[in-house]
């Protein structure tokens, strides 16, 4: 018997880990991607059949409203998975980000996640669904990205709080990917140099992320060790 198609929202699904996750899921599930790109830029990179809503998380309230409206337009009355993957950051040497950079980082990485979790909880509860917060190993502290690290630490705390608050109604997990071969560092203004060669490829990180989501465990760190050795590589599928 074929598994039922799940209804899944993915933020930050037009590049990097998010896009690779969407590509893995699109043929088996109904996907709504939310992102900052215009429709004309986003739709060509997404698999056929994936819905898209232009919802830049730099304005968390407007983005939350746009995503909820897109779900209603699609006729969704419940939500199986909410994957809050979108993230941004700025690299600085010997200091801390500017006020504008701090506001943008916290808006995209933390405030939007809080608002989306609150707004979409009723959809998740109807499905007995899962909220997945995509953090980072940087949540333990990252010198070049202090506000980014703080925002990911905030997500870790949010996951713990919601996991207790929503117990028995909605599963909540935090997943912390390790260094991944995406455009993130370049966009942040940081060149990792030759270290980039040992970063985990985005498609392999997405495979581990899918497995972690399917397992519903929390917290989960998707590390070099798991990738290179294959140990507990989170190879399950949604």
Please give the residue ranges for each predicted region.
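Substrate-binding pocket helix/loop in short-chain dehydrogenase/reductase
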Residues: 93-106
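Conserved glycine-rich cofactor-binding loop
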Residues: 14-15
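C-terminal helical subdomain
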Residues: 174-175, 190-232
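Active-site helix of classical SDR
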Residues: 117, 151
């Amino acid at each position: 018997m074929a598994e039922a198609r799940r209804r899944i929202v993915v933020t930050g699904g037009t590049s990097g880990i998010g896009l690779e996750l969407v590509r893995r899921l699109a043929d088996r599930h109904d996907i709504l991607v939310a992102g900052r790109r215009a429709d004309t830029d986003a739709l060509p990179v997404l698999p056929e059949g994936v819905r898209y809503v232009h919802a830049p998380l730099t304005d968390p309230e407007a983005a939350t409203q746009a995503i909820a409206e897109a779900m209603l337009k699609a006729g969704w009355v419940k939500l199986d998975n909410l994957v809050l993957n979108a993230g941004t950051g700025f690299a600085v040497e010997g200091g801390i980000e500017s006020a504008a950079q701090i506001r943008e980082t916290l808006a995209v990485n933390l405030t939007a996640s809080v608002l989306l979790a609150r707004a979409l909880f009723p959809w998740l509860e109807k499905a007995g669904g899962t909220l997945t917060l995509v953090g980072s190993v940087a949540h333990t502290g990252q010198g070049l990205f202090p506000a980014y690290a703080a925002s990911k630490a905030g997500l870790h705390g949010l996951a713990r709080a919601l996991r207790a608050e929503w117990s028995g109604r909605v599963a909540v997990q935090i997943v912390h990917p390790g260094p991944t071969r995406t455009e993130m560092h370049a966009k942040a203004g940081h060149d990792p140099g030759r270290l980039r060669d040992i970063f985990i490829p985005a498609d392999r990180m997405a495979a581990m992320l899918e497995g972690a989501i399917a397992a519903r465990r929390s917290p989960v760190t998707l590390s070099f060790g798991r990738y290179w050795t294959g140990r507990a590589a989170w190879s399950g599928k949604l």
